[in-house]
Amino acid sequence: MKEKISKIDKNFYTDIFIKTSFQNEFEAGGVIPPIAKNQVSTISNKNKTFYSLAHSSPHYSIQTRIEKFLLKNIPLSASSFAFRKERSYLHYLEPHTQNVKYCHLDIVSFFHSIDVNIVRDTFSVYFSDEFLVKEKQSLLDAFMASVTLTAELDGVEKTFIPMGFKSSPSISNIIFRKIDILIQKFCDKNKITYTRYADDLSFSTKKENNILSSTFFINEISSILSINKFKLNKSKYLYKEGTISLGGYVIENILKDNSSGNIRLSSSKLNALYKALYEIKKGSSSKHICIKVFNLKLKRFIYKKNKEKFEAKFYSSQLKNKLLGYRSYLLSFVIFHKKYKCINPIFLEKCVFLISEIESIMNRKF
């Protein structure tokens, strides 16, 4: 656990967080304004809405410094694995390889369910009780102005922690720390392994333990979550024995005994790579592979000259980046296995083979 951090005072806030941001307003005795809607772009993806804060916004610079000098120094629970340096999805899954029965739970609208009043209460201990601007705006109020957004959400005007803001992931982990600790205590008492990756909660037990399939278990977790006004998406409740697939990552203990299981990727997770390698061996062009396999198309614009040369260079670089991305991805499994010895041996051989194939193509084609 990191050392206890000192409270942030006015001098630190102005010298480190604000710096030159809102300099004119601050010198004129004005408050730090809330984030303007015209500084934010909305991106919809399936059932989720992401918010992107313009890099030109003074709040973007403030968020960056808040992240570096405050949020990254606040201790988190040992159960949380998302948005943390040197922790990955594999770290989130690995503790469950020792078990046989698995349960996955999902929180409804995780980021946008974070109560801003709870955010205020949680972060109040990190700021001294001072005004940033004399009797107009406290340090805590200035902080809230830079990390929240007031906009229409589900048809209602609301102030919330936006999914997509630079500071939101760390804030979510800090807010959830209390819940993580309570869930962990419950799990320790009932011999359950617990890990969390953002809004994904995973639980596992040994063969003889039947608690994960009980109504009691769901009710207890729901009750703990409700303390901070979070709700379970009960339609996404998943309980499996021996094998469970989470986003294409598979944990399995085929023997269903108390020996160690392992982790692999589902076959569908690498389909695009296999298709790309097949097309490359056929001699297909980079353009054909990018469009057919990865659905990457060059946006239309007016060419002054050398259209074919420009397109060839564009699609070649895109294909190269895709292959290098897959190489890094597969290599992460090999590296992880060296320390934790938990990757499926057949899948591990596949990783080594595919890495070799990609490197061979890089040497020949690019």
Protein language model regions, located:
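Conserved hydrophobic residues forming the short capping helix/wall of the S-adenosyl-L-methionine
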Residues: 187
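Catalytic palm active-site di-aspartate
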Residues: 104-108, 164, 168, 190-208
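Right-hand nucleic-acid polymerase module
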Residues: 1-132, 143-165, 174-184, 211-366
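Beta-propeller folds
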Residues: 135-139
